[in-house]
Each structure stands twice: as structure tokens, then as C-alpha cells.
Amino acid sequence: MALVIHYKAGQYLPITENWLYNQLINVPAFEAEVYCQGTQNLDVFPISRLRSFGAGRMTSGRGFLNKLLNETGRNPFLARQLRRDRPDVVHAHFGPSGYFVSGFRRERGFALVTSFYGYDISVLPREKPRWRRRYSRLFERGDLFLVEGPHMRERLIELGCPAEKALVQRLGIPLDEVRYEARRRPEGGEVKVLLAGSFREKKGFPDALEAVGLALGLRPGIELSVTVIGDSDGSKAGEKEKQRILGKIEQYRLQERVRMLGYQPRAAFVEQLYLHDVFLSPSVTASSGDNEGGAPVSIIEAAASGMPVLATTHCDIPGIVIDGTTGYLVPEGDTKSLAERLVSLASDPSARVEMGAQGRKIVEQRFDAREQGVALEAIYRSQIDGSRGRREPAHVERAENPL
């Protein structure tokens, strides 16, 4: 059986990166092994083959040493393990991981596929110009570069990736774990709104809460409640965003309407989907330039469950949320339009049911983890058949197909 190494120059695996795990387990024709730096949540994301390099703090000890060696582009521990395992394909997750392993690609003879996810395109090259130079070398050495959607693909090409090497490979979800359920509520009853994500500026949570406050003013007597799943990661930026969120709750006197559950495992998030009527996800481009890159996987899961999604025309979100069909889209930062659309959804239970049904269809057609696994297998095979980097599977998209 052919071997694919999934390499991530960071910990395997944060609870919010379940979308990466879906890529590991849905290509059964390839044996999967993980290379990483430290581990967490192994009970949630079990994997039979795993090699952790330099586990520990990134500021001292083995973790710091491994980080320094990665920066040279010639980490001897990584080189030794690649020599032992002799993989057919290395699938690097995030741009820096691709660069760190790319120096071994020719001498070890593996195909190198690198997936970009957002921050590695939108922020890293801007904040640290050396990454533009490093990406140039990666684009020369690597075989294929995968992104979630056409918007992200264009950004990758702007960074210098050859267009023929940049492919759209969607992030799928396990449909058997997210069942469809129509939310049939009586008109005039309480409408429950769900937000989910880390407290980062790009998530737009302050805009979401402001929209709720404005909606209550637009339609007196409307009953809205909000559940927030997520929290600050403890960083300075995360704590600042948390204070902005709490400030909006206080400003619009939403204390009695908002429940904050903190971080929750994915199973708890999925359970909460069925207790709510509208998924609110108004992503924005952060002041740092950070953005979603593609689209939040939580939007895909919410749509799969049969819930309409209210979001923004941000990155590749329009590839999931079809305005007026599976939910509504408004411009980034337009809280007035967001509030108006929220009132519209809250006032029309039958429209919510119809949009939820259409959302499920879109997810089944385009975001089934098993189908995306088939596509990923085809990508791997195209790179180990003697024509690495010169041929792609016929069904892999270079740009968005119209619905």
C-alpha cells in the first residue's frame, strides 16, 4: 500500500482542526502517517502511525530546537525519518510545513502536495517578507498546491504559485455525523441564533451581536436568543476580541439573551445545531489582513444540518451560502443589512425550512468528506504515476464551477 505522510509543523491536533482529520481518514487506499511537533486530543483524533518531532515548548528545549532546525530548511530529524519511511507522497498542511519539507523532495523522491488554509496566505507573507521568498522556492520545488476555493486560489497565484499547480480541493465533512433535520417552529416563537468559532477579529462576532441588537430595535416584540460557542485562545489579540464581544453584549443590553458556552468538542457543537434556527457567521477581513482564506467549516456543518446561514461575501463563503437560496449574504461589516436579514429569517419559519433543505443539498453535492477523499486520492495517484506535477485528475477543479 502506498504511504502518504501528513506533515504539520505544529501540534496534532487542535480541536478546531477536525477538517484536517477528515483528510487523513477518508483516503483508505493510502496508508497515512502523521509527522508533527507535539500532540493533543489523540482520543478525539486517533491515528495509528504518528511521529512527533521536538515535542515541548516552542521557546525552549526540544520544541525550540526543532523550530530552529525547521527554519534552516534542512531539519536532520525530519530528513532521517523520511529516509526510513520512504513515503510516496508528503502532504504538508499549511504553507510553512510545505517549505520546511520541500528541501528533501528531490533527494527522497516523494511527491509534495501542500495545502494552504488562510493565515499562511493572507497574513504571513505580509507580516514576514521572508515568507514570500520561501514560498517562491516552495512553488518551484512542490508538485501541487491545494486550496479550499477559487478566491483562495487567486490569492495563491498572486503570491507567485504557477496557475497549473494551484488546485481547488474542498474540505468535506462526514455527512453521516451531521444529519438533516427541518426546524419546524411556530411563527412568532423564539428564534435561536448560533455563533461558533474562536474569538478572532476575522470571525466578526462583534458585528453579529450588534446585528442582533439592531434587529430587536427594527422589529419590536421579536424574540431572539443567542448561543456563542468559542472563546479567546488566551493571546493578547484573543483577549482584546473577547472584550469587544462583551462590550457589544453590554452596549445592546443582551445579557439576558446571550449564552456563552466557551470551547466545546465537535460533538457538542453538532448537538447544538439542532437546538437553533439560524447560524450567524459574518466573517470580515481583520485589521492585520487575516481572513478565512476559504470558508469556515462550521458553515458547512450548519448547512448540512438543515439550518439557514446568514453570512458575508467574504473569501469563499459564497461557494457555500447561496444568497436567497441557502441563506443570506451581506457585505462585510454591514451590520444594518445583517440585522434586516436576521429579521427576515426570524419572521418566516417556512423560508428557514426551505433554505435549510437547499443548504443540505449543496453540502451533499459538494462537501461530502468521502467524495472529497476520492478526489484527494486521485490527486495523490496523479503524482506517483511517473508524471509528477505535469498532470492532474480530470475532476479536480482549477476554478469554481457554477451551481
Regions found by a protein language model. Name each.
Residues H151, G172:
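Carbohydrate-associated surface elements
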Residues H6, L146, R184-K203, L209-L214, ...:
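Conserved donor-binding/catalytic core segment of Leloir-type glycosyltransferases
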Residues Y274-N291, M307:
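Acidic donor-binding loop of glycosyltransferase active sites
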Residues I299, A304, P308-A311, V321:
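Short hydrophobic beta-strand element within catalytic cores of glycosyltransferases
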Residues E239-A267:
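Nucleotide-activated donor-binding/catalytic signature segment of Leloir-type glycosyltransferases, i.e.
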Residues M1-R49, E397, L403:
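N-terminal subdomain of nucleotide-sugar transferases
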Residues A92-S97, F116:
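Short His-centered aromatic/hydrophobic patch
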Residues D323-G324, Y328-T335, S344-S350, Q365:
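Conserved acidic donor-binding segment of nucleotide-sugar-dependent glycosyltransferases
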